[in-house]
Amino acid sequence: MIKKIGVLTSGGDAPGMNAAIRGVVRSALTEGLEVMGIYDGYLGLYEDRMVQLDRYSVSDMINRGGTFLGSARFPEFRDENIRAVAIENLKKRGIDALVVIGGDGSYMGAMRLTEMGFPCIGLPGTIDNDIKGTDYTIGFFTALSTVVEAIDRLRDTSSSHQRISVVEVMGRYCGDLTLAAAIAGGCEFVVVPEVEFSREDLVNEIKAGIAKGKKHAIVAITEHMCDVDELAHFIEKETGRETRATVLGHIQRGGSPVPYDRILASRMGAYAIDLLLAGYGGRCVGIQNEQLVHHDIIDAIENMKRPFKGDWLDCAKKLY
């Protein structure tokens, strides 16, 4: 029977992580469980840096961006001997189960601990929206709001100078954030990793827009696809229109979470405790069709496919 749990945040931070921690902590305490917060993700777990959390530990946290427990990259956690030390630290503290909030790398760590016999529940916390088994991740909608605000501001100056703007959006190898921002921001063109990209085809589309009388344009592109400064120079050379690149960078990860992310994080945090009390371990939580769901974390990582939002792309193209 579970009496004490641990909670950590891992990988890149996302708005709503604090709300998720709060959801875990307060739900666990309501059910009579003790909660230990683990600093700096798997690194802190390995180094045995933990703190007892109570209701007041998470007061005034639901509106704060980032993660008050901290996060860190710790690739050494792939080493089974490192994980064995981590499990020993958990057992030494009397911790019976672990809630991990983070992205796919964090899920991998939780999966490895599960394979070694320690029960874990994964909550999807990343702005990239690239986690299998869930429609949306904690932080996605806040990042979307940040990106759209930036695009709106760029549109003001681009229209004033009849300029083309290339905006690089986070997402790693998932185009969801770029696609959503392109639709909500009214971008004229969108480039995502799920679809083959040609600079020449993009330029031809831009030229076609200019021929129709378009005075300015915004191109939204997912990071890692190309050097956006070089792309901007290429567009300017081929079209004769002044073109500038803007890399939004880590500003997309910050800020107070929007209400949807606060609600999603709170629901998922509480649901994680429900699962643990029901005897589940080695699960990852998601939301599908607005219903909370859970999947075997090993099956989710190794076998589940994440569908591309092709209908979003079709919509964006119709609105060019």
UniProtKB/Swiss-Prot annotation:
<feature type="binding site">
    <location>
        <begin position="73"/>
        <end position="74"/>
    </location>
    <ligand>
        <name>ATP</name>
    </ligand>
</feature>
<feature type="active site" description="Proton acceptor">
    <location>
        <position position="128"/>
    </location>
</feature>
<dbReference type="InterPro" id="IPR000023">
    <property type="entry name" value="Phosphofructokinase_dom"/>
</dbReference>
<dbReference type="GO" id="GO:0006002">
    <property type="term" value="P:fructose 6-phosphate metabolic process"/>
</dbReference>
<feature type="binding site" description="in other chain">
    <location>
        <begin position="186"/>
        <end position="188"/>
    </location>
    <ligand>
        <name>ADP</name>
    </ligand>
</feature>
<feature type="binding site">
    <location>
        <begin position="22"/>
        <end position="26"/>
    </location>
    <ligand>
        <name>ADP</name>
    </ligand>
</feature>
<dbReference type="GO" id="GO:0005945">
    <property type="term" value="C:6-phosphofructokinase complex"/>
</dbReference>
<feature type="binding site" description="in other chain">
    <location>
        <begin position="214"/>
        <end position="216"/>
    </location>
    <ligand>
        <name>ADP</name>
    </ligand>
</feature>
<feature type="binding site" description="in other chain">
    <location>
        <begin position="126"/>
        <end position="128"/>
    </location>
    <ligand>
        <name>substrate</name>
    </ligand>
</feature>
<feature type="binding site">
    <location>
        <position position="12"/>
    </location>
    <ligand>
        <name>ATP</name>
    </ligand>
</feature>
<dbReference type="GO" id="GO:0005524">
    <property type="term" value="F:ATP binding"/>
</dbReference>
<keyword id="KW-0460">Magnesium</keyword>
<feature type="binding site" description="in other chain">
    <location>
        <begin position="170"/>
        <end position="172"/>
    </location>
    <ligand>
        <name>substrate</name>
    </ligand>
</feature>
<dbReference type="GO" id="GO:0003872">
    <property type="term" value="F:6-phosphofructokinase activity"/>
</dbReference>
<dbReference type="GO" id="GO:0000287">
    <property type="term" value="F:magnesium ion binding"/>
</dbReference>
<dbReference type="InterPro" id="IPR015912">
    <property type="entry name" value="Phosphofructokinase_CS"/>
</dbReference>
<dbReference type="GO" id="GO:0042802">
    <property type="term" value="F:identical protein binding"/>
</dbReference>
<dbReference type="InterPro" id="IPR022953">
    <property type="entry name" value="ATP_PFK"/>
</dbReference>
<feature type="binding site">
    <location>
        <position position="104"/>
    </location>
    <ligand>
        <name>Mg(2+)</name>
    </ligand>
</feature>
<feature type="binding site">
    <location>
        <begin position="55"/>
        <end position="60"/>
    </location>
    <ligand>
        <name>ADP</name>
    </ligand>
</feature>
<dbReference type="InterPro" id="IPR012003">
    <property type="entry name" value="ATP_PFK_prok-type"/>
</dbReference>
<dbReference type="GO" id="GO:0019003">
    <property type="term" value="F:GDP binding"/>
</dbReference>
<dbReference type="GO" id="GO:0005829">
    <property type="term" value="C:cytosol"/>
</dbReference>
<dbReference type="InterPro" id="IPR035966">
    <property type="entry name" value="PKF_sf"/>
</dbReference>
<feature type="binding site">
    <location>
        <begin position="103"/>
        <end position="106"/>
    </location>
    <ligand>
        <name>ATP</name>
    </ligand>
</feature>
<dbReference type="GO" id="GO:0032553">
    <property type="term" value="F:ribonucleotide binding"/>
</dbReference>
<dbReference type="GO" id="GO:0051289">
    <property type="term" value="P:protein homotetramerization"/>
</dbReference>
<dbReference type="GO" id="GO:0030388">
    <property type="term" value="P:fructose 1,6-bisphosphate metabolic process"/>
</dbReference>
<feature type="binding site" description="in other chain">
    <location>
        <position position="212"/>
    </location>
    <ligand>
        <name>ADP</name>
    </ligand>
</feature>
<comment type="pathway">
    <text>Carbohydrate degradation; glycolysis; D-glyceraldehyde 3-phosphate and glycerone phosphate from D-glucose: step 3/4.</text>
</comment>
<feature type="binding site" description="in other chain">
    <location>
        <begin position="250"/>
        <end position="253"/>
    </location>
    <ligand>
        <name>substrate</name>
    </ligand>
</feature>
<keyword id="KW-0963">Cytoplasm</keyword>
<keyword id="KW-0547">Nucleotide-binding</keyword>
<keyword id="KW-0021">Allosteric enzyme</keyword>
<keyword id="KW-0808">Transferase</keyword>
<feature type="binding site">
    <location>
        <position position="244"/>
    </location>
    <ligand>
        <name>substrate</name>
    </ligand>
</feature>
<dbReference type="GO" id="GO:0006096">
    <property type="term" value="P:glycolytic process"/>
</dbReference>
<dbReference type="InterPro" id="IPR012828">
    <property type="entry name" value="PFKA_ATP_prok"/>
</dbReference>
<keyword id="KW-0324">Glycolysis</keyword>
<comment type="function">
    <text>Catalyzes the phosphorylation of D-fructose 6-phosphate to fructose 1,6-bisphosphate by ATP, the first committing step of glycolysis. In addition, is involved in the utilization of D-sedoheptulose 7-phosphate, an intermediate of the pentose phosphate pathway, via the sedoheptulose bisphosphate bypass pathway. Catalyzes the phosphorylation of D-sedoheptulose 7-phosphate to D-sedoheptulose 1,7-bisphosphate.</text>
</comment>
<feature type="binding site">
    <location>
        <position position="163"/>
    </location>
    <ligand>
        <name>substrate</name>
    </ligand>
</feature>
<dbReference type="GO" id="GO:0061621">
    <property type="term" value="P:canonical glycolysis"/>
</dbReference>
